[in-house]
Amino acid sequence: MIFPMQQLIEFQGNIYEITCAATRRAFQLAAVCDPVLDELGGKVVSAAAQQVFSGTVDYRIEPQELG
């Protein structure tokens, strides 16, 4: 599975934020050996990015405590 570049180009949000979300999701998929990886030939980052950009997986920014 190749991530559709057009979807990335048209993204209007914070690209750093969604990249961090996709990275975290890739870690989660790899850690639990999610069955979706078998369907996609083991492409963890592509699977995670597709899930985050398509809205299959929601993410939120947690407030950081200072001090």
Swiss-Prot record:
MF GO annotations: DNA binding; DNA-directed RNA polymerase activity
Keyword Nucleotidyltransferase: yes
SMART domains, per the entry: RNA_pol_Rpb6
Any single biological process term in GO: DNA-templated transcription
GO CC entries: DNA-directed RNA polymerase complex
Pfam family, one: RNA_pol_Rpb6
EC number: 2.7.7.6
Keyword field: DNA-directed RNA polymerase, Nucleotidyltransferase, Transcription, Transferase
Subunit structure: The RNAP catalytic core consists of 2 alpha, 1 beta, 1 beta' and 1 omega subunit. When a sigma factor is associated with the core the holoenzyme is formed, which can initiate transcription.
Function in brief: Promotes RNA polymerase assembly. Latches the N- and C-terminal regions of the beta' subunit thereby facilitating its interaction with the beta and alpha subunits.
Family: Belongs to the RNA polymerase subunit omega family.
Protein name: DNA-directed RNA polymerase subunit omega
Lineage: Bacteria, Pseudomonadati, Spirochaetota, Spirochaetia, Spirochaetales
